[in-house]
Amino acid sequence: MVHLTGEEKAAVTALWGKVNVDEVGGEALGRLLVVYPWTQRFFDSFGDLSSPDAVMNNPKVKAHGKKVLGAFSDGLAHLDNLKGTFAQLSELHCDKLHVXPENFRLLGNVLVCVLAHHFGKEFTPQVQAAYQKVVAGVANALAHKYH
């Protein structure tokens, strides 16, 4: 559960309505893989991840980034029940994929940076603070199975 004020919730929702999920998803996942190269081990089947350009232009990275942001969108629609919303994904990432839960926090922070880059002055300190709460809540929900 994420505790947002009415203003914060409105700001998150308003900005998210302008997000190009295809573009931002691929960019966020790509940046995660470039900045934290050890995360690439979870994506062996994605082909060429040998350079930043290869990662950022990889169609499988872009497609999976879109899928990740689709799940994030579901979370935004269920902020009062993030653990329930992400229960299956938490189980998958814990039991089958063995993804360290810290990676969820890293991806959330990268997503905030990508949103700031795309929205510039519209991504005010107040909007950033609200999004930090949301990505922390999502990361916590995804890590729930690990506890």
UniProtKB/Swiss-Prot annotation:
Query: Keyword Iron, does the record have it?
Result: yes
User: Which parts of the sequence carry N6-acetyllysine?
Assistant: K60, K83, K145
Name the keywords, alphabetized: Acetylation, Heme, Iron, Metal-binding, Oxygen transport, Phosphoprotein, S-nitrosylation, Transport
Q: Which cysteines are joined by disulfide bonds?
A: none
Q: Does the keyword Glycoprotein apply?
A: no
Q: Phosphoserine-modified residues are where?
A: S45
* InterPro entries (alphabetical): Globin (IPR000971), Globin-like_sf (IPR009050), Globin/Proto (IPR012292), Hemoglobin_b (IPR002337), Hemoglobin_oxygen_transport (IPR050056)
Q: Which residues cross the membrane?
A: none
Q: In which tissues is it expressed?
A: Red blood cells.
Q: Name one GO cellular component term.
A: hemoglobin complex
One GO term (biological process): hydrogen peroxide catabolic process
Q: Which domain of life is it from?
A: Eukaryota
Positions of modified residues (S-nitrosocysteine): C94
Q: Which SUPFAM superfamilies match?
A: Globin-like
Binding sites annotated in the UniProt record for heme b: H64, H93
User: Where is the PTM Phosphothreonine found along the chain?
Assistant: T13
Annotated ranges, domain Globin: 3-147
Q: Which PANTHER family match?
A: HEMOGLOBIN FAMILY MEMBER, HEMOGLOBIN SUBUNIT BETA
The family this protein is said to belong to: Belongs to the globin family.
Subunit notes for this chain? Heterotetramer of two alpha chains and two beta chains.
Q: What is this protein called?
A: Hemoglobin subunit beta
Species source reads Aotus azarae (Azara's night monkey)
* Gene that this polypeptide is encoded by: HBB
